[in-house]
């Protein structure tokens, strides 16, 4: 059978550098850092005392008090970002066939704050099991797409992909394939995460995964810099409306880009460390290109996973060298995590959005905070250091990798109106 074409017709973002798509792009294009000392709790005794929190987000601006209490922050973020994307796409919810609209969402952790607080309350009690009746439905990762579908009446496929930091990229690839195969007309996809909590910070600190640059929070996320010392935890959500091309054209939708391919692979190497030679990462990019029917030379821009970890950044660039060869020096490579921090399960969504907006505006956002050259990194790479660069982008790639060796890659193509 002939596969259907899939396009992006709506975007929504709730990030540490902007609470809407417009604000997010302004932050990206100007090299804004979303990192600051933690305000959600007293982090004085933590090894890392900073994170990329949302700024000026008040749940009561979007939900009544009763509704807000029933939702963990990760689900609140999902509803807010998906609403923006649905509105941006101009979907007519009164006439659309809701049996052919799905919600496929990504969350690596889900309701961590809810889980943490309920366990603390129980531990501080007398052993009597007094739990909030909303404990489980607030915590489970699948509640985010469930609530999106309940709010809008979408009755197509509805589930959450859980693959650590690759979660929302996997969700997008599933959404792509459902539409390509003709099973849906529209899918709301993306991801959300809210792990800036005592448990989140403490857990990642125990793994020695986070930067401890407490004297310079804004400069802590520094992908590809020789002095990088771990990732910075972020939070938020990204939402994309994926739609069958002819369906989008028929209703006169504005099209941001075409989703032309998705690839997945596994490192099969270690629980948390990447394969040092980037074998799984090499394979996922090759799989994505093959799925799209495109050549390495077609790619103009790569938004890397680029977490600012000593091992991960080098392994990814090794893989890029293997896949793209001499063409690698022609590609604008960046890591927007230098600005947003690492949104875990939402990373693939917000970074895909960054790639799509870079394509739209012909401007590649910078990799900020770079000051010391890493001798293990080929100097011929254009890592878009410290300042945005103008670039005509016809094809953009977004890489996302997760603990457990999960690798996902999504490819977007500019589509002429």
What are these regions (language model features)?
Residues 78-91, 144-145, 149-152, 158-193, ...:
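Active-site-proximal alpha-helical scaffold in enzymes
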Residues 8, 23-24, 29-163, 192-201, ...:
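Conserved beta-ketoacyl condensing-enzyme motif
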Residues 5-9, 36, 215-292, 301, ...:
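Condensing-enzyme catalytic core mediating Claisen C-C bond formation in acyl metabolism
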Residues 125-132, 173, 177, 193-250, ...:
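Glycine-/small-residue-rich "gating" segment that lines the acyl/pantetheine channel
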Residues 1-67, 246-256, 353-368, 413-417:
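ACP-dependent fatty acid/polyketide chain-elongation machinery
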Residues 1-8, 97-98, 292-298, 329, ...:
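Flexible, low-complexity linker/loop segments at domain and module junctions
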Residues 183-229, 262-276, 306-313, 330-381:
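Acyl-CoA/ACP chain-elongation machinery
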Residues 22-27, 113-128, 178-181, 201-214, ...:
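A glycine- and small-aliphatic-rich helix-loop capping segment at beta-alpha/alpha-beta transitions
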């Amino acid at each position: 059978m002939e596969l259907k074409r899939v396009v992006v017709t709506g975007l929504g973002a709730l990030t540490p550098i902007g609470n809407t798509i417009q604000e997010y792009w302004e932050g990206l294009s100007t090299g804004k850092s979303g990192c600051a000392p933690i305000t959600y709790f007293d982090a004085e005794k933590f090894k890392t005392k900073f994170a990329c929190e949302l700024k000026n987000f008040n749940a009561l601006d979007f939900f009544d008090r009763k509704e807000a209490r029933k939702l963990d922050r990760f689900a609140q973020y999902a509803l807010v970002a998906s609403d923006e994307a649905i509105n941006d796409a101009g979907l007519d919810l009164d006439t659309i066939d809701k049996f052919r609209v799905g919600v496929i969402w990504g969350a690596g952790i889900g309701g961590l704050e809810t889980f943490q607080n309920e366990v603390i309350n129980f531990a501080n009690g007398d052993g009597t099991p007094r739990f909030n009746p909303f404990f489980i439905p607030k915590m489970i990762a699948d509640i985010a797409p469930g609530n999106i579908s309940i709010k809008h009446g979408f009755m197509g496929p509805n589930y959450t992909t859980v693959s650590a930091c690759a979660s929302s990229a996997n969700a997008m690839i599933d959404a792509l394939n459902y539409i390509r195969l003709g099973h849906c007309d529209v899918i709301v996809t993306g991801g959300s995460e809210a792990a800036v909590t005592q448990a989140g910070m403490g857990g990642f600190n125990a793994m020695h995964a986070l930067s401890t640059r407490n004297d310079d929070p804004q400069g802590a996320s520094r992908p590809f810099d020789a002095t990088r010392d771990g990732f910075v935890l972020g939070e938020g959500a990204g939402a994309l409306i994926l739609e069958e091309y002819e369906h989008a054209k028929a209703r006169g939708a504005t099209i941001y880009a075409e989703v032309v391919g998705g690839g997945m692979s596994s490192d099969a190497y270690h629980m948390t460390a990447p394969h040092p030679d980037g074998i799984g990462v090499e394979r996922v990019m090759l799989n994505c290109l093959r799925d799209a029917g495109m050549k390495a030379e077609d790619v103009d821009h790569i938004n890397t996973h680029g977490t600012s970890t000593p091992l991960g950044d080098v392994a990814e660039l090794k893989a890029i060298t293997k896949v793209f060869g001499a063409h690698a020096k022609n590609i604008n490579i960046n890591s927007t995590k230098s600005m947003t921090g690492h949104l875990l399960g939402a990373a693939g969504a917000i970074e895909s959005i960054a790639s799509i907006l870079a394509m739209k505006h012909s401007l590649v956002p910078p990799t900020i905070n770079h000051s010391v050259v890493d001798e293990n990194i080929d100097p011929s790479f254009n890592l878009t250091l410290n300042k945005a660069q103008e670039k005509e982008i016809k094809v953009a790639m977004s890489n996302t990798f997760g603990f457990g060796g999960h690798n996902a890659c999504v490819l977007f193509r500019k589509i002429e109106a």
